[in-house]
Amino acid sequence: MTFTRRITALLACLMFATSGQAVPIRSLPGQKLPDNYYRTERDNPAVWAPERSYAYTRGAAPGDYAINDTPRKGNLTYPLILVQFPDLQFSFNDRESLMSYYEDLYNGNGCTDTVGFEFRGNRYYRTTPSVSDYFRDQSYGQYVPKFEIIGPITASRGYAYYGQGDDANVEKLVLEICDSIITNNLANLSGYARNGMIDQLSLIYAGSGENYDGSDPNTIWPHADIVYVRSRDTTVYKSGIRRIKYSCSCEIFWDTDSIPDGIGTFCHEFSHTLGLPDFYNTDYNNRNEADKDDEENAAMGYWSLMDYGCYNNMGYLPVGYTAFEKYSLGWLDLEEITYQGSYDLDLISTAPNPQAGIHTAYRLSTGDDGQFIILENRNRSGWYRYNGGKGMMVTAVDYNQDGWVGNYVNNYNPKHYRILPADNNYGRETHKGDLFPYQYSDSTGVHVVDSITTKGQPELKAGTSYPSFSIYNITRNGDIVSFDVVSDLPTRISSPKQEEISISLSDGELTVSAPRGSTVSIYDISGKPASRTVTSAPVQKIPLPGSGIWIVKCGNITRKVRL
C-alpha cells in the first residue's frame, strides 16, 4: 500500500469511560497519532452503558456479536449532509452536478462507469458502485440503506477552525450544521431519531482529509463519533434529539484537487455505527510497534473492510464483508460441521440456501463456546475483485467481550480474529499465499498446500482451543471449493459410510441411494458446477443436465458418468 490513513472510529470503548477520564479516539492503521491525542468525556458515565447484552455461547444467533443494537434490516434512510466552508468549497461547478454526483455515489444501483486516472506515476481505475449497493450486497438484500442528500451547507467558520490538527471543533460543526438544517426547514432530522438517538448522520466535507500523507494538518480527519446534545436552549435539543452518531468523510482524494474520494472510508466508518469493531491493531500508545505488527503479524489485512480492505483499489472498490462480519450483523448464519465427510462451499458473495444445497460459510466449533473456526470461499470478482487470490479462507475467532466492546480485538497475541494463512506467513503484504489450496515452487519442485490440520502449520486452532476435525483435499473447481473433513477423535459422529451411498445411471437418469438430506453435486468435465440436489428420499432419481461426461459427487463417493 502506497499511503496510510487514520480514521477515528465510533466504538464502545467509550462506553466504559468514567467522568473526567481521558478517552482515546480510535483510528485506522498506518498513521502515527499526535501526542496527547485524547478527548475527555464529560457526561455521566451511565450514558456509555452498553446498548445491548453480548453473546458468548455456541447458540448465539446471527447478529449477537454486534456491539450495538442499531437496526440492520430493511430499507432504511439516513441523512447525508454536504458541508463546505467559507474558505474551502466543493469542487463541482454547480449545485445540480454536486447533488447528482452524490445521489449516484450513495444511492445508485449498479454504477459501472470506469474512469482511469494517473496518480504519482501509477494508473488507477475508479469503478465505484454505490454505498447502497455495497451494503445491499453484503446483507444479501436484507439491508438497503438510502441517503437523503442535504446541502450544500456552508459552515460559519473556515475549515481550520474545525480541524486544527486534532479535529478539536468537529462536535461544534455537527451541532451547527444540524441547527441550520432544522432552523431553515431543510430536512426533518427529528424524524431520524430513535429514542432521541440519530443512529447515523453522515457529513461529506469539501476538500481533502487530513488522513492522507502530506495533507494540510488543519483539515478534518475522516472519523465516526457520538455528539451529545447538552444545551436545552438549542434548536437541536428542542427538536427531541439527544445523541447523534455521526461519521464524516472528505470530498477529494489525497491532494489531487479534482479526483473524488472513494467509498472505502465511508463504508468502514458506517460499519462501526452498525456494530463492527476494528480488526487491526489499535494500540496508538505504541503506534510504531502497532504498524510493525500489522506488517509482520497482521490479523485480517486486506481481507476485511475493518482492517486494510477498505483501501482496496485505493478505496474505490473496498473489499466485501467476511463471513464473520456478515454473521455478526445478522445477515448470515454459520452452518455447523458436526460429522466428517466431503463438503462443498459456494462463494461468500452467494446468498446461502442450505435446503437447495448452497452453502456459503461453515463453522467448526471447539471445546470453548467463544472459540471457533470459519470456512468461506473467496474469488476475485465483484467486491472481492482486489483480493490476493482465490480459494478457501480459514479464519479463527476467539471472542472476548471486553476486546470487542473496547475496540482492541487484535492488539495482543494471540489475535482474537485472524486469518490462518495457507503459506503460514502472517504478514499483511503476503496475502497472495493466504488461501487454500496454495501452490508454490522451491528447489525440490512444485508443492500444493491443500490441507489444514490441528497438528500442522498453521495450526487449525482458535485461541487456545482446537476443533475435533482437520481439513484435507481442498480443491477449487470453478467457483466451488470442495474439501474433506476428517475427525481427530475416534468417537466423533461420522458421515454416512461409503457403502451406504451408491450412484448409478439408467435411462438418462441418476439413481442415488443415500441418507435423506444428502447433497448430490454434478459438475461438467472441467469442474464447473452444473446442478445440486438435496435428496428428499433414501432412493432418488436425478436427471443429468444433458449429454456428455459428468462428475457426480455425494458424500465420500465421486462417480464419472457419460450420457
Q: Where do the language-model regions lie?
A:
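Primarily auto-inhibitory N-terminal propeptides
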Residues: V23-Y102
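Non-catalytic C-terminal accessory/binding modules of secreted extracellular proteins
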Residues: P24-Y38, S91-D133, D137, Q142, ...
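Acidic, glycine-anchored loop motifs typical of Ca2+
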Residues: A187-D199, N288, D294, G403
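C-terminal tail/sorting-segment detector
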Residues: Q21-A22, S494, S547-L563
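Glycine-centered tight-turn motifs at strand-turn-strand junctions
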Residues: T519, P529-G546
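Residue-level detector of functionally pivotal "anchor" positions at catalytic/ligand-binding pockets or at interdomain
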Residues: V486-E509
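Short, glycine-anchored, charge-dense loop/turn motifs used at functional sites
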Residues: Y523-P529, W550
